[in-house]
Design a protein with these regions (language model features):
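N-terminal short leaders/motifs
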Residues: 115-130, 178-189, 254
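Membrane-proximal low-complexity regions enriched in glycine and acidic/polar residues
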Residues: 141-241, 245
């Protein structure tokens, strides 16, 4: 019975030990992915900011500028592209909506971003665009890969429509989470005017005819939770200018927008809470279950060997009872005792 139990435990030990690396290196890469129908929004603010007044064509100091970013998954488009690509694809329709202190639109730039649901690598297909212009992304945007590494990545900049390195600058603690801090600086670059302008009658084409161009620079900062690859905080030191042409008095330059853009505090709180819960699920597949299965396999193996050793130990032999003494020998011994008594009597009698 012990030998049979030992074999069962040994089989279980082998199973759980083999399951440990399979969970980490086979199951995790296939199970961890971005859902295609995900929706999320984020509000960022620059307080205070500099904003161009298109009525006077002069830059003005304003109390705040609000930027609302939304990401919405297009499930139908994902399914259609998956059938031809043969892998899990996510299609995000993003919108960056900038509003002045009065709530009126300053700009609205849509994007369509396609990427691999598991690795976050960009996928190139029809419909990939920024503000209606076809683009071909290289590197990441919005999110880092699961199990982010301490290294530089290539990050896509939607304003310039180009990719550039975003540099790993160290490990920090943010709201109780260990995060990786990344920075990217885009130098002054000529960029396209938004298709939607804040003043009726002014279009990118009419501005271009006047010879006026738009220039942009930014310092981009992200605090990324490395297990999920999700940014828990983001900031930009952002500046835009209009330069030259007949639109500006004297053909000089004017600040169109400048400010230190930060995530609003309530959105930071909700993002940290969401990422913390998702982090637990990823750790379950990459750390808790693999190490738990490995430890369980070791315990079962030790128990199996213990039962096997006990099963092979020889059973103790029963003690044999002593052989009974012969009856004749007992009578002679009794006679000797009687004779001793007589000798004692003789000694007593010899006293007087």
């Amino acid at each position: 019975m012990r030998r049979r139990s030992s074999l069962v435990l040994l089989a279980c030990a082998v199973f759980f030990t083999a399951l440990s690396p399979l969970m980490r290196w086979y199951a995790f890469p296939r199970l961890a992915k971005i859902p295609p129908g995900q929706y999320q929004d984020m509000v960022l603010e620059a307080r205070p900011a500099t904003l161009l007044n298109y009525g006077t064509m002069k830059a003005e100091r304003v109390p705040k500028v609000t930027i609302v970013q939304t990401l919405k998954g297009d499930v139908a488009a994902s399914d259609r592209i998956e059938r031809s690509a043969g892998r899990d694809i996510v299609v995000w329709d993003a919108l960056s909506y900038v509003a002045g202190p009065d709530g009126k639109m300053v700009s609205a730039i849509p994007e369509r971003y396609l990427f691999d649901a598991h690795s976050q690598e960009p996928v190139h297909a029809t419909g990939e665009m920024v503000d209606g212009d076809p683009v071909r992304r290289e590197g990441i945007e919005f999110k880092w890969p699961f199990l982010t590494e301490r290294r530089d990545y290539t990050y896509f900049d939607a304003q310039t429509r180009t990719s550039a390195p975003i540099h790993y600058k160290g490990t920090r603690t943010f709201r109780g989470l260990e995060v990786y801090y990344f920075e990217q600086t885009i130098p002054w670059t000529r960029v396209a005017l938004p298709k939607k302008m804040p003043v009726k009658g002014i279009t990118p084409q009419s501005v271009a005819k006047m010879g006026t161009t738009r220039w942009y620079t930014t310092k981009r900062m992200f605090w990324v939770e490395p297990v999920t690859g999700a940014p828990v905080n983001g900031q930009e030191i952002h500046k835009e200018e209009l330069r030259g042409g007949d639109l500006l008095p004297g053909g000089g330059k004017v600040t169109a927008f400048a400010g230190h853009v930060k995530m609003r505090a309530d959105y930071v709180d909700s993002t940290v809470a969401l990422v913390t819960s998702q982090r637990t699920l990823v750790l379950l597949l990459t750390r808790y279950l693999p190490w738990g299965f490995l430890l369980l396999g070791a315990v079962l193996l030790a128990l199996s060997l213990y039962l096997e050793a006990r099963g092979r130990r020889p059973a103790p032999t029963a003690a044999r009872p002593p052989a009974p003494e012969a009856a004749a020998g007992g009578g002679a011994a009794g006679g000797g005792a009687a004779g001793g008594g007589a000798a004692g009597g003789g000694a007593a009698g010899g006293g007087p």
